[in-house]
């Protein structure tokens, strides 16, 4: 070592050698030795078998990787961020997308059922049916109206009122 103001010129090879010397000294410390040996001595951990719910959830998550939902993941991530839920796990985002898709589908199906019952009740109460009404029910086209959507949303706990005036 240099002392008393001596000039030392160190080549890059010598500086690397001196750096590895210090690393070897660090490994010789008792703390580092215990960490090295702890990797070798793994305690026996008993694996707990998955319950049926956990195995079904794992299977669902694996199936979601290949499925592309109607609601894009980017839209779901944006809505989650605006609601204050930030996540980087794409599995959670995909699960929320599929859940939202099912919720919307359930509401649309309920509204369709309300529309069908409303139109059949109107036909039976009027007492007369024209040739147009005798079409096959599968050929009939239905239009989503507020009259059908409000009770469908009420079935799911969402209160919605038709505005009295349009501005």
UniProtKB/Swiss-Prot annotation:
GO terms for cellular component: cytoplasm; histone acetyltransferase complex; nucleus; SAGA complex; transcription factor TFIID complex. Belongs to the TFIID complex which is composed of TATA binding protein (Tbp) and a number of TBP-associated factors (TAFs). Also a member of the histone acetylase (HAT) complex. The lineage of its organism: Eukaryota, Metazoa, Ecdysozoa, Arthropoda, Hexapoda. One of its GO terms (biological process) is transcription initiation at RNA polymerase II promoter. Its main location: cytoplasm. Residues 41-56 have a biased composition (Acidic residues). It comes from Drosophila melanogaster (Fruit fly). This is Transcription initiation factor TFIID subunit 10. Keywords: Cytoplasm, Nucleus, Transcription, Transcription regulation. TFIID is a multimeric protein complex that plays a central role in mediating promoter responses to various activators and repressors. Disulfide bonds: none annotated. GO terms for molecular function: promoter-specific chromatin binding. The keyword Lipid metabolism does not apply. Residues 1-56, 119-139 are annotated as: Disordered. Belongs to the TAF10 family. Signal peptide: none annotated. Residues 130-139 have a biased composition (Basic and acidic residues). It comes from the Eukaryota. It is found in: Cytoplasm; Nucleus. The keyword Transmembrane does not apply. At embryonic stage 9, highest expression is detected within the ectoderm, ventral chord, and anterior foregut primordium. Later in development preferential expression is in the foregut, proventriculus, and central nervous system. Coexpressed with Taf10b in the lateral epidermis and anal plate.
């Amino acid at each position: 070592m240099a002392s008393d103001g001596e000039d030392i010129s160190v080549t890059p090879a010598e500086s690397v050698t001196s750096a590895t010397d210090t690393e070897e000294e660090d490994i010789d410390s008792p703390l580092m030795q215990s960490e090295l040996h702890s990797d070798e001595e793994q305690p026996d951990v008993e694996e707990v078998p998955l319950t049926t719910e956990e195995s079904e959830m794992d299977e669902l998550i694996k199936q979601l990787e290949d499925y592309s939902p109607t609601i894009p993941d980017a839209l779901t991530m944006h809505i989650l961020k605006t609601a204050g839920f930030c996540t980087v796990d794409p599995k959670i985002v995909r699960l929320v997308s599929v859940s939202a898709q099912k919720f919307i589908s359930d509401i649309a199906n309920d509204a369709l059922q309300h529309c069908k019952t409303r139109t059949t009740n109107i036909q039976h109460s009027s007492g007369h049916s024209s040739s147009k009404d005798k079409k096959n029910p599968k050929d009939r086209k239905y239009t989503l109206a507020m009259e059908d959507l409000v009770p469908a949303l009420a079935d799911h706990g969402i209160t919605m009122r038709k505005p009295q005036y349009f501005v």
